[in-house]
Amino acid sequence: LVGSEMCIRDRSPKRKVPCICDFTQIASKEEVEQLSAEELEKRIFSAMEYDEYRWQYENHIRIASKQRAKNIHRILYKCPTCGTEFEMDSTGTDVFCNHCHASWHLDEYGELHAKEGETRFKLVSDWYRWEREEAIKEVEEGRYHFEDDVRIEHFVNAKVGFKKLGIIHMTHDEHGYIFDGTLDDGTHFHLEKPCYETRSMHIEFDFKGRGDALDIATLQDTWFVFPLHSKNQLMKFNFTTEALYFKTVEKK
């Protein structure tokens, strides 16, 4: 399915972009009986890979919105010019770095143009893949570590919604996700999500207008945690969570 992300991304106004869905048989009945689980998984993951920005560019899909770059810094959090993380911002048709002041224009067909100097990444997806490679390198070299105080909320049920529990401390590194602290009612909260159990992380940008959130779940409960001091960290969590998972699994 291509086109959907261009329509619903957290930007306004809404865009009228064609959506195209292709149905593909990944494996026949006979292949399912013969192939290993690993090979079937590989085929599924391969079939689910797609690049909306390249699709837009190659098919000349025009997005004329004057706000087409709004919030794109949520994805493009690292500056390719100075290497600074979490100082990117965006408005209108531009994305820019608040640290070194490098700036790029996003044209109507999804191509990026540096306002000064050479354009290192022509497409948003190329920039995104570079960020992922940088995050993986950081994990592999043992340099990755994150910590911050977070507001934790417990999802009670669909009728009641979320209940605020208090402020605790969160760390994320080769030990996995660790949440620890004293809740507002005086009880101690401690939860660990080891790397080998966490292949991916569900993130929510500005969840219900209450801030960026991570969805932490067990078989019994669901909590949303909101980092209090770090900004625009969510996309990097996607990369580092996956990288830490594979690094840990390969060691076992």
Predicted regions and their residues:
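Short, small-residue-biased leader/transition segments that mark boundaries at the very start
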Residues: 1-7
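Cys/His-rich short segments
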Residues: 61-118
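Short, surface-exposed beta-strand/loop "edge" segments at domain boundaries and coil↔beta transitions
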Residues: 103, 160-163, 184-190, 219-233
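Anionic N-terminal interaction surfaces
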Residues: 112-170
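Phosphoinositide-binding peripheral membrane targeting modules
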Residues: 157-211
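Acidic, Ser/Thr- and proline-rich intrinsically disordered linker/docking segments
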Residues: 194-252
